[in-house]
Each structure stands twice: as structure tokens, then as C-alpha cells.
Amino acid sequence: MEIRFTNINENQGVRDLWTYCFADSQAYVDFYFKNKYKPEKTMVVEDGGRILSSIHLNQHRLNLSGKDLATSYIVGVSTLPEARGMGFMADLMSRSLYEIGAMDQSFAILMPIDHRLYRSYGFETCYDILEVKLDIFDLKKFKLDGNFKRASMEEADDLVDVYSSAIAGYNGSALRDQVYFSELIEEMEIEGGYTYIFYRDGQPTAYLAYTIDGENFLVREVYYKDMGAYQSVLKFIFNHNTQCKTATINTGLDDRLMDIIDNPKDASFTLKPFMMARIIDLEKFLVDLEIKSGPGEEASILNPEDRDIKEGHSVNIEVSDPVIRENNGIYRFDNKSGILRAKKYGNAVSDLYGLAENTILGEERGSLEKLVGDLPDIDISLTINELASLLFGYRTIEDICFIKGMEASDSLKAIFDFEKKTNYINEYV
């Protein structure tokens, strides 16, 4: 058995595995393997010339904390039935996470089929999505303020324009280009769907991608530059009232539809956990993000008697990671530069935390016990999962401490003094 990146000679085996494990149409499988699949970014378990398991590491860029960062979006997690329950996927996932680190990427994302499974690999929910269901006649009152046009490949630039404007207020959104939207148009058509752009005074100001599922108008995504454009989209949806009785709209948590329809009580607004994230390299992740925390440069202009309480804080945090042993250990977090940073206490500590529970230390026992005795006091213990939700801005330190049944200390509040962010992403592969 071998775990490695696949090659073009094994494309059919990877494709056969995908076809067996996922209920996608033949047309969609053709689309995916033509446009999205990259053998050099696909990890497999191969045995005797057969592909038993695979994980696809699809490459994306996210705008996270205002930074343009590369990441791997883990999709296509699959195993042939005869190889299930043998531990192949655990080994493959572990190896894949290390390979992501080797790409110089400090985090990964994944849309889970089961949150429990992926939490055991160090992933944590960092994105939710809002699903709105309502009677299509709830949208009757809205007015059109321009015209709609079905998107073709030539309008990919207009889609980029609308999308880039719409995500400016979100955290963690994927960065998309003309190639992405050309593929989205093709994907929607393959799935029996449509992509329409709304123009006002000749300028693109909104778009929606949707399918008509029986009598339900299902919006996969909608983005807009202003509320007037959104209301025109809602009127566009209503104009399908002879075909559809209901509408389902997938959108961001800050959607204002509840505020503008006349009777929101009869509609449903459901928050659904959507995307998980995973920190690959904790120290690098913080360097990549450059999260502003603490007083920063303003401390230098304070009176000397005030400066000691304004020059930043530090805490010691014990971090546990079930897969990437290099993340295990005790870190000193500080914000004295105005930017949140973390530094681990020595490689020996990392080695100690990476040891299996029943490891026999032999001659090393004495030095390791001395090292343990020299360790700093710990302010809090956090899992790599909890740190992902915190550093993505999905939860605050007060949230995490409350869930853990403890009170956040003043030092923790001073270190993690940033607020929750509105995280929104709507990528499927």
C-alpha cells in the first residue's frame, strides 16, 4: 500500500472512485474532471495498481482578515467499499494535511458530510449559511429597477465585478476570477440551472445562480451591490410565480430579507453550519493573518505612568492537535507589537507533547521530567479546533470559555480583543 499524489495514468481509477461514492450526474463528473480535477493535487491510497481512497486538494484563494491567502479546499473524500473500516482514510487525511503544509499553506477548508468525523481530524465549523424558505408571493411587492440578462462566458467580467463588490464586507470569502465564473456558468447549465445578471443603467449590480426544482425556485447563490439591486432580484424570482409556489434562497447571515418582507413569520430563516476550517501551522497562520490586537503603536505616545498597562499582554496557551504533532505544545501569545503572535516553547516541548500516552522514555525520562518542571504556567488549554474558530473570527474568546464552562480572564480578553466577523463562503468544489 502506498499513500501519494496520483498521476495522469490513474485518472480513470480516481474517476471511478468518485462515480461510485457520489451521486453526481455523468455530465457533472465530466465537468469536474475536465475543469477542477488536478492529479498533482490529489492524494490517493494505491494498492496493487488499484485506487482505494482519495482526497482532492482543490486550490483556492481566500480573503481572510484582509489578506489574500492560498488554501486547499478538501473535497472528494472517498474510499471503495471493500477498503472501508481499515484505517486507510485516517492515514490518508493525516498525510494530506502534512502535504498542505508542505505547499506553504497554513490552513485548509472542508465542507463536511459529518461534523463529528472531521472534528476528530482537527477541523472546526467556521462558516454558516442562511437558508430562507418562503411563499413566492411574499416577493410580489418588490419592483424591478433595470433589466436582467442570462450570463454567457462573455459576461464573466461582470460577474467578477458584482461578486468582488459584494464580498467586500465579508471575512473568509473565496477570491474568484473570470475563469471561475466561466466554469460556474457551465456548471449551472450542466445541472439544469441558470445564471442571470441584473443591470441598472447598463452597469452590473447583482446576479443569481439558481435551479427550478419542481415548484421550488432554488437560489444557489445571490450577490448584489445594494438593496435596490437585491429587491430587483426578488422581483425576478417572483416573476416565476406561474412555475413555482415557493422559493429557497441560500445567502449570507447578514441578509436583510427578514426586514423587508411584510410577514416574515410565515417564512423560515434557518442558520446552517456550512464550512469547516483547519489550522495546519499555528505560528505561520498568525504570521499570515497579521491580526490586529492590543494597543500597538499608540502605546509609544502615552505618558510613562500609563504605558505599562498599554504595552500589550501575553498569555501561555497549551495547544492540542489530534493529527499534526508539530502544533502540540505550549505557546506564548502576545500582542505587544499590535499584531497577535504566537511562539512555541522549544522543540523539546513539542516532542514531549507528541509522544504517545504509553511511550517508554528510558534514559530520556530524567531530562524530560526536568523539562516538564520548567514549563511556564498555563493560562488556558485550547484544541486546534477551538483556535480555528477563534482566529477565523467565528467565535470570541468569551464564547469559547463559556462553552468550556469557565470565565475568560482579563489577560485572555486583552490578547483576543477582536470581535466576531461575518464569515461567508459559497464554494462547492
Model-derived regions, located:
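Flexible glycine-/small-residue-enriched beta->alpha junction loops
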Residues: 125-141
